[in-house]
UniProtKB/Swiss-Prot annotation:
Natural source organism: Lactococcus lactis subsp. cremoris (strain MG1363)
Transmembrane regions: 16-36, 40-60, 86-106, 126-146, 156-176, 192-212, 238-258, 284-304, 337-359, 364-386, 408-428, 437-457
Matches recorded under InterPro entries: AA-permease/SLC12A_dom, Amino_acid_permease_CS, APC_YAT
GO cellular component labels: plasma membrane
Cited PROSITE patterns: AMINO_ACID_PERMEASE_1 (PS00218)
Membrane topology: Multi-pass membrane protein
Family designation: Belongs to the amino acid-polyamine-organocation (APC) superfamily. Amino acid transporter (AAT) (TC 2.A.3.1) family.
Descriptive protein name: Histidine permease HisP
Keywords: Amino-acid transport, Cell membrane, Membrane, Transmembrane, Transmembrane helix, Transport
Functional description taken from the UniProt entry: Involved in histidine uptake. Has low affinity for arginine and lysine. Plays no significant role in the excretion of accumulated histidine.
PANTHER family, sorted: AMINO ACID PERMEASE, GENERAL AMINO-ACID PERMEASE GAP1
Amino acid sequence: MENQNQVKRNLKQRHITMIALGGTIGTGLFLTSGATISQAGPWGAVLAYCFIGIMVYFVMTSLGEMATYLPTSGSFSDYGGRYVDPAFGFALGWNYWLNGAITIAVDLTTAGLITQFWFPHLPSWIFSGIATVLIFIINVMAVGAFGETEYWLSTIKVITIVLFLAIGLLTIFGVLGQGNVDVVANLTAGNHGFVGGISGFVGVLLIAGFSFQGTEMLGITAGESEDPGKTIPKAMNSIFWRILLFYIFSIIVIAAIINFKDPRLLNPSSTAVMSPFTIVFKNIGFAVAASVMNAVILTSVISSANSVMYASTRILYSLGQEKGAPKFFGRTAKNGIPFYALLATTIICFIAFLTGIFGTQIYLFLIDLSSLTGFLAWLGISVSHIRFRRAYIAQGKKLEDLPYKAKWFPFGPIVALLMTGAIAINLDPAMLFSEHWGEGLALYAAIPIFIVLYFGYKWKYNTKIIPLEEVDLSREK
């Protein structure tokens, strides 16, 4: 294993676009979207995705400005350490690595759940294990080969969603399905399409947030992009709107064809979980198409895990380079792959997905925990951007010299900061006093863990919040 210490800039714009799409469109859309409909009703789910979508847009513009100015595989972990406080960057890095490990575990568990459609009598963990080995092999390849693989996997995913939307619309308007679907009744079920009122809406925000996680991979791919100054802004503009429209239209189609009370939708009491995409085809009488759709969804979930593995590995690699983790994590193989970081992430994920054996309650807890750590990452991006822009102005630099300028500053990052903070704090306190108190305690632990990482590093290295005039605005890593 050769320590070359540098990843390689072999990712083209189409790779970057599809890696971010692939990392975002996966379990969140193909399985957990059913949970938002089940718990908040059709329009409660749509409203939750719109709410989170606005917040994510502001986060994306903040990240885009920093990523084009200073492309690095450490992304917002590096930005937090450079523009705020080294301790802040350290905490962000480990938080995001934890987020990635949990997210991959969720995706791998999802892969096992999806295979139950064909093999209901076999343990789901067998297929989760096979998927783990597969994504490890893909990530061992040189980054160019990885990018090409993810490009085609994500292309299949996008085509699938477009076909699903087309068939769904034909069903809604009565062309398909032989009139078996009562669209009006499904969309107005509950309290005019809402279930649980405000609490139902707030309760699914974490799940909706989980669905949008992966958009921040755009910043991480900048470190291996051929021309980040041009590719990142173009990719960012196309990625966000594609993701938002895919989610909103898919939720509406699913809610129109499936009643929110359908027991096959993901919820804490589910015993036989099925993708809402597969349920749609079964409901309109396309049994063969349902099986094909399930197979495509399986590849999509593996694609999502594949992208997140890429991002998590790069974050751990960056921590190793910056002495925030053992040095060997900052080493690369001859093909530029941070092998030790990849191996460590795979081992953690392999252990974590076993928790999926204990049922949908634990599975939903993992989704919430993954979402919460993701919200902390988005919060960190917003804080870093505010500090970056203030330092940029304080040091007399011209805004027109920025490769990409966030349009809504300072409104955008401030709103994103307030929204992420409010959602992260406004979890479900009642869980701490219910039979699921252990899961509630573990979920809330994500915030104190971040705080301990921050102040622990601060205490050990005696760091401070960097004065604006002293912030390092050089464009070299």
